[in-house]
Every structure is written in C-alpha cells, then in structure tokens.
Amino acid sequence: MSDGPKIVLTAEGATASETLGSTVAGFISALPDNYISSIISKFYFGVKNKKGIAFKAPYGLSKVEASLIYSGISREDVVIADPNNLDKIIGNDTRILGIYVMDPLGLSFGSGITYWILKLAGLPYQGIPYIARSFLNILINPSVLKHRKYLKIVVGGPATWQLTDTGFNKKLGIDVVYEGEFESKGPALFKDILNGRDVPKIVLGGAANLNDIPTIITPSNGGLVEITRGCGRGCSFCTPTLSGMIKSFPFEGHIDKEIKVNIEKGKTKDINLHSEEFFRYGAKGIDPEPEKVIELTKKAYKLVKSYGDDYTISTDFTTAAVVVESPKMVYEVADYINEGNRWTFIEMGIESGSPRIIKRLMAGKAKPFTPEQYPDIVEESIGILNDNRWVVVGTMILNLPGETDDDIIKNLELLDRLKKLKVITWPLPFIPMGALRHRDFTILDKMLLDPLRGEFITRALIKALSESKDSLELAVDKMYNPITKSIIFNIGNYIINYVINRYRETLNEYNYIKTRKQKREILRETL
C-alpha cells in the first residue's frame, strides 16, 4: 500500500473514535476545542488501528465501504483510515478521500446543548466544537495537502447540510458533497471520479432499495447493527423522514451476518440493534407487528448468547406512541434486552409538550393517538419503559417554526409531569433539517435571554443532568479499562454537581425576572 489505495474513507476524529468503548460518552466532542488539549484528544478520541487502517468505524462509514466493494470496486482499492494516521494510508495512487461527517461546522443539536450547558454555568465558550475542529484537521492534514492536486474530496453523512446551506463546501474547497443514502448513487459517483469524469458539486441520492444495501465488512463502533431504515411518521424537521416508510432488514443473511462481524472481528460484547423505531420492526405502516419484533429479539439474543453468557443486545430509539400502543410487546422484549436487573438507555424524540405544535409539524408522531393525547402518551410511555429497566433519553425542541409562549408553557407543564420518571430531558435548539432546512439558524443566546425559554432550558438541563448523574455508572459501563472508567466517573460526577448548583442559582434569577414582569402587568392592568 506504499502508493496508497484509490479510495480512502475516514471520519471526523471525534466521530471515528469509540471514545474508550463508551459511545454514549461521545457528547464530550461537542465541547469547544479550547477545553480539549492534544493529550486529552489522543487519550479520549484515539482510534484503534493497524498501520493506519481503522479496526472499527462509524456504522455509516462501514456501510459506504461495503457498498463500494459490493458494486465491484476491488477490496484492495478501498480502505477505512484512522483520521489521525492519514499519512500512513494516502499515497500517489489515492484519488478519492471520502469523509463521513456528523457535525462538521458545530451546528448540530449536541453543540447547541453544550453551548447552553456552559453558558448557564457561567463557564467560558471559546473556539469551535472539537468535533468541528477534528473535521477541519482532516482538510489541512499534510498528507491530504501533499496529494491534493490528484485527490477529490467527497463529504457525506447526516450533517452535510451544514456545508451546503452555509456555502462552506465551496469555501473549504470540498469537491463533492453527497446527500442521501449512499447505496442509491454513491458507488456510481465514486466510479465516475475514478474514471476521470466530471461530477456535480452536490449529488442528491434518494432512498436505496433494500436489496441494494449490503452487510458491513469493517465492524462498527458500539456494535451497531441496522435493523430498519426510515420511519414514515413524516415529521417536518427530521432527516429519517427523507428515507420514506420504515423498511426492515431480514434477520437471516443480513442482521445475523452483521452481528457476527461485530462479535468475531470487532470483539464487541454488546450488539446495538439500531433503528429509528425499534418496536416497529417488520411493520408495513404505523402500527407495530409485535410478533415480528419479539421474534427478531429472540433470534438476536440466541445468537449473541451462543458466544457466551456475558454477551448482550440493546437498542437505541423508540417513539412514545408505539410503546403505549403495544405495552405487552415492550415487556416481552425487555426480558431479553434488560434481562435480570440490567438497565440500558433508549432514546425518544419527545420534541414538544404542545398538542398544537405536534399537530402542526409532527402529527404522525402521535399516531395512532391524537395530538391532543400526546402529553399523556409521553408520560405513560416513559413509565412503561422505566418499569422495564430503560432509562429514557428524551429530547425537546425549542424554536420550532410558529412556536409561541403558550407552547413553551406546555413544555414546562410536561416537564413537571416527568419529574419523578427516569428520563434525561435534553432541550434542543431547532436546527434546519429535512423539509425545513433552509430556515435561519437558531440564535442560542436569544433563547437564553427570553425568561420563559430560559426557564425551560434551565429546568430541562437540571432534570437531564440529575438523571445523568444517577445513570453515570451505566454511561461508562462499556469502557474497556476499569481505571479509566473510575476516573471518568469521578470527574463526571464532580462536574455535574457543580453545574447543577449553578443552574439552580440561574433558575432563581429567571423566577425573579418572571415575577417582576407579572407584577408590572398587574400594575398596568390596575392603572
């Protein structure tokens, strides 16, 4: 490989890393780069590799590699590289550098939350998010610059909109931005580049056919195995909406193969059955098909247990509606995923406690229930999941199009209803995506300065961090090194305590401002 493979695939340094074995802890990459020294970067965001070739990769990047090889490109011509060791891989024969991005400019939800976390705690925010810095570091890597004359840079992944919507793809000299599912048009694009043909600056790939999606060759970070693609609930702001109705992969010949790759080659002991909505595996429409979900769970459980009793399965996403629609299914699945006294995390896009917002922007999220029932559904679903040993990681979005103060009050009311449940409530700033992607970017400071929105953000973060503290042991559980696990646990515990205390002080200030405003309004009405 002295002259380099024709295609080198990589990702932002923060995205490429397994973060010491705990992908849940990867949120640290959203911190400003001035908080992360080169020593911390190498320690926390290192990528296990052999002569620059990554041992594991982000799932999406593993899929890109598999698609290229499946399309007929030679295995020797495609390599997934550690972004910190590109000099060992890129050579004179390299013609394409493909970069997978999750947050190339630091405009994602995670970066927005981190900004609020630091700002409300009175901590300085300088520079750009580390994850964005790790992307820019690839572009200025000496080996990339050395071979730039003959090298086309292609950027893809779920956050490419950040580049195209801001025009930074041109400013940064990126040759091609690929948007959409890679399997649909990606292999043809790469072949055109290798054959010296002219290609567009932006390529829009549609939803791929299920039969055109191959199984991964390189193991995935976090033991991720995709069991479905798409969602079909039709939320206006959501990228999975662009993939259309939910499509389920067969267990035999697809899911089982990826489980084996992750266990046998990746040495992974926990398999994450990834889906935008796990409990709708096998569904043809909105309603779940419980027998198919239970059958999948049993098969996956049986397969991983064939490698040893300490091998486990987990999943990552659900909606509130499907849990309430079929609670018996949830209980049966939990017997396998959360066997014994095991607890795991599961994510839920709550998004809003306002039936008006739900009806206007994401009516499908409540189906088969009505938007008016949605707050009740959220509360009930989290209770069911807690009863089955899931800690829910819930998101609630601010600054959605058409949002009013009444909608924020509904959010606060829902937050109050959730205070005794195990749910980590992250407040998210609206970021343009999907059908709404061309709206202006969220102004984070403006939301903090608004007393009502500032109060909601602060209350949501207090709840989120309090639950995170209680679940900190679970968050670091998959870290490989017990000493590292102990260090991260204790540092995290200290930081969370400090930040929560600062937030309570801030909340008192918001309450003072709100009370003063109410008194002024009463006085005005009296006069």
PLM features: residue spans?
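Catalytic cores of alpha/beta
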Residues: 164-172, 329-333, 401-417
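Glycine-rich beta-alpha loop elements in corrinoid/cobalamin-binding modules
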Residues: 60, 79-213
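Radical SAM enzyme core and accessory elements
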Residues: 1-37, 90-92, 449, 453-527
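Flexible glycine/acidic-rich beta-alpha junction loops that bind and position SAM and/or redox cofactors
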Residues: 106-111, 233, 272-286, 350-365, ...
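Canonical Radical SAM [4Fe-4S] cluster-binding loop centered on the CxxxCxxC motif
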Residues: 217-254
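N-terminal [4Fe-4S]-dependent radical SAM core
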Residues: 3, 16-24, 188-225, 270
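Conserved SAM/AdoMet-binding glycine-rich loop
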Residues: 9, 260-391, 398-400
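A solvent-exposed, charged loop/short amphipathic helix patch at secondary-structure junctions
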Residues: 24-51, 104-135, 361-370, 452-461
